[in-house]
């Protein structure tokens, strides 16, 4: 069969044969097979051209996707699947991209962790979760995480949280809040506890007392509608204790309050 036309159509080329068959191919395919109008090709050569065109198109799509930022194997695979590239072609494309180091899950994980240490605020557990969602194996994740020390980051995040909550919570509640916030960000309890111990927390007794009285007023308005006497004091004591206030401080303000 003979090639009767090769015509550029945006990013692809339309190739027509004298048996009326048409197919879209990439410029790489034309160069690879040195195709030209009037060229005779066999059925076997046509099949090879079709396979290569699909591979070349898939690779071009992947490179376009990678041109914006680094991607994992899973991200590239999902992108090609959404663009109807066949599974066997996707495997070929990924093998080619990995060989040329366009896709490297280990390198991606390393960069992801470094970026978080420089500008992020997440601990190892959250990073593991995020990298796992991106399709990176647990082995690679663990090996890359083991290369980094999160002490400085944990301390930095703890300092930031302290600035946010200090003066707004009683001492015990402040400690609980800081520890829980650090754990929620993916740091281990041990890391959170150590970071908390590194903090320079100034106890402002006057502020603590002011917070306690303010909370007592709030709880009194709530419970005095239903309770009085001993029952009211018990309700207030329990409510204030749940807020993180010390029992001795609660007893002291209740004596002044009633």
From Swiss-Prot:
Any Pfam family hit: RecX_HTH2
GO CC terms, sorted: cytoplasm
InterPro entries assigned to the protein according to its UniProt record, in alphabetical order: RecX_HTH_1st (IPR053926), RecX_HTH_2nd (IPR053924), RecX_HTH_3rd (IPR053925), Regulatory_RecX (IPR003783), WH-like_DNA-bd_sf (IPR036388)
Compartments, as annotated in UniProt: Cytoplasm
UniProt KW Cytoplasm keyword: yes
Main localization category: cytoplasm
GO biological process, one term: regulation of DNA repair
Keyword annotations from UniProtKB, A to Z: Cytoplasm
Superkingdom of origin: Bacteria
Entries under HAMAP family matching the protein: RecX
The protein's role, per its UniProt record: Modulates RecA activity.
UniProt similarity note: Belongs to the RecX family.
Full protein name: Regulatory protein RecX
Species whose genome carries this gene: Streptococcus gordonii (strain Challis / ATCC 35105 / BCRC 15272 / CH1 / DL1 / V288)
């Amino acid at each position: 069969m003979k090639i009767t036309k090769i015509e550029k159509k945006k990013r692809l080329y339309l190739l027509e044969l004298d048996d009326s068959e048409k197919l879209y191919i990439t410029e790489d395919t034309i160069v690879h097979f040195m195709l030209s109008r009037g060229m005779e090709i066999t059925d076997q050569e046509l099949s090879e051209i079709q396979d290569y065109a699909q591979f070349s198109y898939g690779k071009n799509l992947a490179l376009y996707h990678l041109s914006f930022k680094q991607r994992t194997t899973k991200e590239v695979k999902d992108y090609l699947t959404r663009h109807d590239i066949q599974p066997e072609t996707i495997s070929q494309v990924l093998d080619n991209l990995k060989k040329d180091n366009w896709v490297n899950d280990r390198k991606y994980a390393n960069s992801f962790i470094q970026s978080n240490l420089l500008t992020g605020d997440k601990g190892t557990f959250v990073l593991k979760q995020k990298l796992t969602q991106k399709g990176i194996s647990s082995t690679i994740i663990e090996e890359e995480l083991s290369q980094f020390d999160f002490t400085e980051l944990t301390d930095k995040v703890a300092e930031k949280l302290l600035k946010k909550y200090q003066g707004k919570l009683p001492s015990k509640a402040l400690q609980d809040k800081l520890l829980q916030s650090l754990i929620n960000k993916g740091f281990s309890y041990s890391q959170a506890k150590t970071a908390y111990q590194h903090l320079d927390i100034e106890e402002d007794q006057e502020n603590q007392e002011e917070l306690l009285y303010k909370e007592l007023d709030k709880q009194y308005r709530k419970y005095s509608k239903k309770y009085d006497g001993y029952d009211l004091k018990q309700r207030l004591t329990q409510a204030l204790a749940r807020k993180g206030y010390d029992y001795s401080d609660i007893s002291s303000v209740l004596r002044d309050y009633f």
